[in-house]
């Protein structure tokens, strides 16, 4: 009886191990990534029905290049909410004009530097009461070296109070960095971070 119970537990462990690696099918490799977030990012880019990559890029795509995880780039910010609810025209990488407003000012310290960044809310998110997302586009000293020259983005969630956790390890490149058919909001110069934010997705020459 004990042997039977042990056998069942052993089988369950094998099944569970396969599940967290997405697939144990012969010839199918696990999705790359050190964190759940990174694995989700890679899975998204590999999915031909959703990926921003071109068909040619998809053929050779294996995984996104990430900086090493760095807890110092997970920062706590004070969010000063703005009263202005007027949405302004934001230029994009195409002729499209995006509608966004400054939801609040996020004040934080990164590598000893005191920084204030504009946190945006899109008009579509504002109109959809179920959409609690915010948008943080930013520039830093890595742009044009090992990150996209036009800056990177972060998606945030509206906090319950005036405290906001910003994890730059989740920073990603605009989709237009990979495919010009995408229309990406231009990162404002006011959101420049005067340090090297070596966290999140990189952008290498082969991209």
Model-derived regions, located:
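Bacterial Sec-dependent N-terminal signal peptides
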Residues: 1-32
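Extended, aromatic/histidine-rich regions of cofactor-dependent oxidoreductases associated
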Residues: 31, 172-207
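A mature extracytoplasmic/lumenal domain signature
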Residues: 79, 119-123, 140-142, 168-172, ...
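Mid-length scaffold segments of soluble, non-membrane domains
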Residues: 86-149
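Acidic, glycine-rich flexible loop segments
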Residues: 135-172
